[in-house]
């Protein structure tokens, strides 16, 4: 079996694929921001308020539902007034190269890139994944070409969540990721060619809110964001070495009950 490591470091989710390549490291941070009211008015962009704290499910499994323990993953607390955006970073940092990944993201059982029901496989047409580091952040669900809705906390079982609206069921709250590294030989060939690839200058860490001109607001709690097309070609992704992680979103009372109020990583 392939050794794939998923760790929490400084409240970032870190996926490492050492058997694929020593530089095959993908980091996902969950950035706090304010929720934009969904009332058909335009609002200025909310600020970035730092990272959400996170904790491993297995560290608190005695206080969690059995189904969560089976699925594993991590916990994240979110207030009703908050929203989150995802920040992606790859490689070993400065001078370490920026290893490309295909990342599938589901909120509930809905694919955040396509807005369709979730499937476990990587799909080429229509592209149902983002490519990082080319796509340095994601602010929400795709709801149309260039338009997204914020990732916000909603109580399950009241018909509010994207999952319930599309599938009519409320089984899987939270956010699910499947991360696929580029195949080793494709990465090595790309490095040798030293193509002027946009991936190699886009992988800084965007800890601040993204630049205004790339995001603009549309009415009704919508924001503008393009999903970048896969410029590498579908066959470069190593589908034999994917890694999956489930992020359970709790409200503050649930978080305190599960973790004893302990804020990890501080």
Label the model's feature ranges.
Residues 3-266:
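Intrinsically disordered, low-complexity segments enriched in small/polar residues
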């Amino acid at each position: 079996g392939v050794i794939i490591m998923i760790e929490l470091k400084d409240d970032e989710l870190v996926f490492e694929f050492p058997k694929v390549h020593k530089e095959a490291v993908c980091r996902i941070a969950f950035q706090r921001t304010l929720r934009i009211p969904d009332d058909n008015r335009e609002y200025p962009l909310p600020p970035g308020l730092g990272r959400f704290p996170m904790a491993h499910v297995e560290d608190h499994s005695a206080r969690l539902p059995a189904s969560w323990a089976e699925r594993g993953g991590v916990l994240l607390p979110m207030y009703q007034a908050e929203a989150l955006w995802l920040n992606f970073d790859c490689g070993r940092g400065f001078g370490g190269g920026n290893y490309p990944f295909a990342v599938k993201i589901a909120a509930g059982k809905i694919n955040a890139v396509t807005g369709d029901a979730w499937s476990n496989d990587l799909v080429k047409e229509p592209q149902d994944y983002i490519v990082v580091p080319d796509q340095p952040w994601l602010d929400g669900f795709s709801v149309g070409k260039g338009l997204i809705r914020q990732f916000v906390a909603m109580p399950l079982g009241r018909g509010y969540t994207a999952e319930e609206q599309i599938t009519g069921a409320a089984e899987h709250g939270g956010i699910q990721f499947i991360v696929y590294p580029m195949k080793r030989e494709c990465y090595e060939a790309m490095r040798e060619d030293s193509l002027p690839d946009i991936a190699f200058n886009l992988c800084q860490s965007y800890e601040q809110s993204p630049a205004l001109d790339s995001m603009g607001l549309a009415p009704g709690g919508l924001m503008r964001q393009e999903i970048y097309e896969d410029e590498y070609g579908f066959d470069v992704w190593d589908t034999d070495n994917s890694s999956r992680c489930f992020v359970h979103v709790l409200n503050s009372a649930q978080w305190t009950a599960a973790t004893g109020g302990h804020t990890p990583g501080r």
